[in-house]
Amino acid sequence: YGIDPDRIGVLGDSAGGYLSQMTGVTNGEKQFDKGDWLNVSSDVQAAVTIFGLSDLTTIGEGFGPEIDKVHESPASTEALLVNGPAFRTYPGASIMADRKAALAASPLGHVDGSEPPFLILHGALDPLVSPTQSAKLFRALKAKNVDAEYVLVDNAQHGDLPWFQKPVIERVVNWFVKVLKPVNAEEAEGAVL
């Protein structure tokens, strides 16, 4: 298909941001290589995450004790992801019931310094995923000397209009051009989708 395996970047927002993070932070972790083409690296060279989750153990952090309590429930999405649903004699479990499993399912649990460059964007007014999730990822990557940028977008919430404006789009496109250095980078400079 003419894809350069040395210039692969991933981007996602919200749940896709979580997937983008997991893809970037699991570079080189063979337990995630499944299926066909196992002779080809699944590593990526750049990752962009937009208002994604980085730590399943603290999803409610930054929103107050009432929201924290919601995320302690065995019925919370993150608890179901890690522990599965309640069934017959199994009552379910909170996300903190197995901290090791929760961290294994969290991007923060995989940061080891081998990550590609990251661009992390979050809305300053996000009511669904606290900006603390992105700030924690940024600090963890920087602590391991990973090339990472964190942009807190003023007046942006969770997938609302500010995300689809020229300044945000250009920031992401130009970052990919800088990091992945496409062959025709001169033509791509300042590109707008």
Residue ranges and their predicted role:
Residues S114, L119-H122, D126:
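Short beta-strand/loop motif that positions the catalytic acidic residue
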